[in-house]
């Protein structure tokens, strides 16, 4: 076989692999609807219930990743800083709630002592 024939044969094989492989995968892979039909009824119901919430959580996560990737730092460091910031805010809210409860208790004591 000539050199050109070998090249044409290899080109044909390459095209079959590059086009046929993904086409075969698409044909064999089930659609989302087919997968959901295979679920048992409990899983199907739970999937329908929690689907919107999970989609929203994923969208929020992707948004955070985009925000973290804008900084010059590694995504891991940016995520850690965001987590530390969230924990600090949570701690501040908790401290504020404790302080309000303490002030309320003191006011109640003063009222009780004034009434006696």
From Swiss-Prot:
Composition bias, Basic and acidic residues: 99-116
Chief site of localization: mitochondrion
Subcellular location(s) of the protein: Mitochondrion inner membrane
One GO CC annotation: mitochondrial inner membrane
Pfam families xrefs: CBP4
Keywords associated with the record: Chaperone, Coiled coil, Membrane, Mitochondrion, Mitochondrion inner membrane, Transmembrane, Transmembrane helix
Transmembrane stretches, start-end: 7-25
Region (Disordered): 90-116
InterPro entries: Cbp4
Membrane topology label: Single-pass membrane protein
GO annotation terms (biological process): mitochondrial respiratory chain complex III assembly
Residues of the signal peptide: none
Stretches of the chain forming a coiled coil according to its record: 77-116
Recorded superkingdom: Eukaryota
Record has Lipid metabolism as a keyword: no
Function field: Essential for the assembly of ubiquinol-cytochrome c reductase. It has a direct effect on the correct occurrence of the Rieske protein, core 4, core 5 and apocytochrome b.
Membership in a protein family: Belongs to the CBP4 family.
Protein name from the UniProt record: Assembly factor cbp4
Species in which this protein is naturally found: Emericella nidulans (strain FGSC A4 / ATCC 38163 / CBS 112.46 / NRRL 194 / M139) (Aspergillus nidulans)
């Amino acid at each position: 076989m000539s050199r050109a024939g070998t090249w044409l044969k290899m080109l044909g094989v390459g095209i079959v692999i590059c086009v046929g492989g993904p086409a075969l995968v698409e044909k064999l892979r089930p659609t989302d609807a087919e997968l959901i039909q295979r679920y048992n009824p409990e899983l199907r119901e739970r999937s329908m219930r929690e689907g919107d919430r999970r989609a929203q959580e994923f969208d929020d996560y992707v948004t955070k990743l985009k925000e973290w990737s804008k900084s010059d730092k590694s995504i891991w460091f940016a995520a850690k800083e965001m987590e530390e910031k969230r924990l600090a805010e949570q701690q501040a809210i908790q401290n504020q709630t404790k302080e309000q409860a303490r002030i309320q208790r003191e006011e109640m004591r003063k009222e009780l002592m004034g009434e006696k």
